[in-house]
Amino acid sequence: MPENLKIEVIPEGTVIDHIPAGKWLKVIEILGLTKPNGGTLLIASNVPSKKLGRKDIVKVEGRYLSEEEVNKIALIAPMATVNIVKDYKIIEKFNVEIPDEITGILKCPNPNCVSNHEYVTPRFHVESREPLKLRCHYCERTINEDEIAQNL
Amino acid sequence: MDWKGRDVISIRDFSKEDIEFVLKVAERLEEELNEKGSLDYARGKILATLFFEPSTRTRLSFESAMHRLGGSVIGFSSASSTSVKKGESLADTIKTVEQYSDVIVIRHPMEGAARLAAEVAGIPVINAGDGSNQHPTQTLLDLYTIKKAFGKIDGLTIGLLGDLKYGRTVHSLAEALAFYDVELYLISPELLRMPKHIVDELRERGVKVYETTDLEGAIPKLDVLYVTRIQRERFPDEEEYLKVKGSYQVNLEVLKNAKETLKVMHPLPRVDEIHPEVDKTKHALYFRQVFSGVPVRMALLGLTLGVLGV
């Protein structure tokens, strides 16, 4: 059986594959899917994967993810692939990519950064993708993967 | 090079060509000033100096630079006498001040404040220090001072001493020096070492970097010793400050093994890290460094206002 069929096929919604093993909870938190009215979620964790060794899969019934939401996942699961499913068929497929600039998703962890005090959209420039390192557009401080995860 | 309307926010926005250009213009202005006494490139132009944090040298040298260019100055030197106290946002303050002036110089306790001001303002904004982040005009005047003293920057061995962890001056100076062929000695107590990401970046850019706690061991190798104050106000806790306070003092004893031509620099204010007995020696360059603030800031004001015809 193909590894992504271990959990039930969904008629309609979004399949997020190739999430690093153990990160599924963080992914659904970032996407705001932990709320009681968030719809049905099917989760497979620690699934063997050729690409990642082990991976998590999250299937979201009845919800299509927007590009901005995909970017949020990119920060925590840079290898993730997203499939949009309609009538049991994949109608759209995206490979998550970290954009050169990240706007409005992440808060700057520097408490003295002006972006935490004035009416301004937080902005980060991607300095490196592996390991992931961002630089705040305003205070110019760099932040690493752990700090990114804490401030999403 | 078209500088009219450009903001001066971070040394990271500058290329080596930009830096060299500013230094060249500063030198030209210094010569013209020596010949004529005062200039009138900025006649009719108004500089607004917005100092939300105290400063002596930076504010006065910007004001002096604008007056020497024939322009005039408005501004404030503490946030307590402004509408910020009533809760006005930085963005609103900037949008107001730009109605009264042609160029803004800002110092603010928050990191990123100058970048935000530049995004809001339609006129050029020059960063005179944003929290512990950047102070690009200090870096440019430091480079100008070194170049004036040695005729070059390439080939020099430069020691940075003191608080290399929190000091914004040494961070941006090190980043700018990476454009040149220099060796850097980073001399500090263990607790105040230069952040690893900066050291890594310097090495990636081809700078030979040596980290040490031993000032006396490093001194004989140096052409320039750049001393910084250990800044109590930047420490998260008093105990950490007390552990490193007074770690180093540059005095005649320390300098006895130095090269004849060694120059000692300091962004000032100093507390006790350079003994006043050094002031009279040929090593002392820190008051000349203060003087450099004026021609370098004249260059930046003149260029961003677009009045120098270059």
Swiss-Prot record, chain A:
One of its GO terms (molecular function) is metal ion binding. InterPro entries: Asp_carbamoyltransf_reg_N, Asp_carbamoylTrfase_reg, Asp_carbamoyltrfase_reg_C, Asp_carbatrfase_reg_C_sf, Asp_carbatrfase_reg_N_sf. Keywords: Metal-binding, Pyrimidine biosynthesis, Zinc. Pfam families: PyrI (PF01948), PyrI_C (PF02748). GO terms for biological process: 'de novo' pyrimidine nucleobase biosynthetic process; pyrimidine nucleotide biosynthetic process. Disulfide bonds: none annotated. GO terms for cellular component: aspartate carbamoyltransferase complex. Its cofactor is Zn(2+). Zn(2+) binds at residues 108, 113, 136, 139. Transmembrane segments: none annotated. Binds 1 zinc ion per subunit. Contains catalytic and regulatory chains. Involved in allosteric regulation of aspartate carbamoyltransferase. HAMAP family: Asp_carb_tr_reg (MF_00002). Belongs to the PyrI family. This is Aspartate carbamoyltransferase regulatory chain. The lineage of its organism: Archaea, Methanobacteriati, Methanobacteriota, Thermococci, Thermococcales.
From Swiss-Prot, chain B:
Pfam families: OTCace, OTCace_N. Catalyzes the condensation of carbamoyl phosphate and aspartate to form carbamoyl aspartate and inorganic phosphate, the committed step in the de novo pyrimidine nucleotide biosynthesis pathway. L-aspartate binds at residues 86, 168, 229. The lineage of its organism: Archaea, Methanobacteriati, Methanobacteriota, Thermococci, Thermococcales. Heterooligomer of catalytic and regulatory chains. NCBIfam families: asp_carb_tr, PRK00856.1. Belongs to the aspartate/ornithine carbamoyltransferase superfamily. ATCase family. Pathway: Pyrimidine metabolism; UMP biosynthesis via de novo pathway; (S)-dihydroorotate from bicarbonate: step 2/3. InterPro entries: Asp/Orn_carbamoyltranf_P-bd, Asp/Orn_carbamoylTrfase, Asp/Orn_carbamoylTrfase_sf, Asp_carbamoyltransf, Asp_carbamoyltransf_Asp/Orn-bd. GO terms for molecular function: amino acid binding; aspartate carbamoyltransferase activity. Its EC number is 2.1.3.2. One of its GO terms (cellular component) is cytoplasm. The gene is pyrB. The keyword Transferase applies. This is Aspartate carbamoyltransferase catalytic subunit. Keywords: Pyrimidine biosynthesis, Transferase. One of its GO terms (biological process) is glutamine metabolic process. HAMAP family: Asp_carb_tr. Carbamoyl phosphate binds at residues 57-58, 107, 135, 138, 268-269. The keyword Transferase applies. It catalyses: carbamoyl phosphate + L-aspartate = N-carbamoyl-L-aspartate + phosphate + H(+). Signal peptide: none annotated.
